[in-house]
Amino acid sequence: MSVPIIVTATFGDGDNGWLQELRRAHYPPERNQVPAHLTLFRQLPPSLEGELATRLARAAAAPPPRATIAGIMDLGEGTALRVESEDLEAIRAELAAAFHGLLTPQDRTWGPHVTIQNKVTPRIARTLQQQLRAGFEPRPLAIRALAAWRYLGGAWAPIRSWPFRR
């Protein structure tokens, strides 16, 4: 059985703590099995692990990407924080071009976000979105590293993390 690889960006300590707290407060506990993250790819074939590691290490040799939490996203049955980052878009585009023929339909496009609530009723999701929009102002988001994970049917097992050069 092949276990897909997930690629994410992880956050600096301050932002990570804030995002984890939002997830603890609003994500159904039985579904909150992974840390706060920004997914770059959801399902890469495990056969890419070696080449992926080389490419992620090369990308992480640069300074951390600039990113901004730019808005609130309605996921229907959940809520996310929309992220804007030309730097992350460039990293992802290079990886997507390298693995083009191996991407799932879901991985062919990208809408960067951090999910803070999922699998709730649309009414509960809309209530949180209204609360978050009331005091929302765009803010910088510190990106610490790129990471690869094995998908285990809910939980994820870390493969490795590549911190950006400081």
Go through the PLM ranges and name each one.
Residues 1-166:
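Histidine-dependent nucleotide/RNA phosphoesterase domain, centered on the 2H-phosphoesterase fold
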